[in-house]
């Protein structure tokens, strides 16, 4: 198995696995260039956040404080998948990259898309020793 990761959105770009005849095939849906990922709004292979799903009316209450977020879900006024730009649109810091492991991190600052507090996210992709698990 061969896996390709980019720090743009902490995204899985490709996973090459052998078919029953030994021919390596890419099993990830995506694009050939970073420019294509930037131009398209699909989250193919990316890390989504701060929130997955929709927050109705782009607001929520936490500890008695109402937070108004930046809506990105068309005319509905909702926020989807952490906003725009979200984690999928950010350049993540590569903290480790070797043969079997890639460790990426991103610091989402207080107020990003309206969300409160700093949030440090660390993501580890690790290929198993038998090359059959990611």
Language-model features, listed with the residues they occupy:
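Surface-exposed acidic/polar loop and edge beta-strand patches at domain peripheries
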Residues: 1-134
């Amino acid at each position: 198995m061969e896996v390709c990761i980019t720090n743009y959105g902490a995204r899985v770009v490709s996973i090459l696995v052998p078919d029953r005849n030994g021919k390596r095939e890419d099993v990830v849906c995506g694009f050939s260039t970073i420019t294509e990922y930037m131009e398209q709004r699909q989250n193919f292979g990316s890390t989504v956040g701060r929130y997955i799903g929709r927050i109705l009316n782009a607001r929520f209450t936490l500890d008695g404080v109402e937070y108004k977020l930046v809506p990105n879900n068309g005319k509905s006024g909702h926020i989807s998948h952490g906003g725009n730009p979200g984690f999928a649109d950010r350049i993540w810091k590569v903290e480790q990259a070797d043969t079997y492991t890639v460790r990426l991190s991103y610091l989402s600052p207080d107020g990003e898309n309206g969300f409160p507090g700093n949030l440090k996210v660390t993501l580890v992709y690790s290929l198993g020793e038998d090359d059959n698990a990611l």
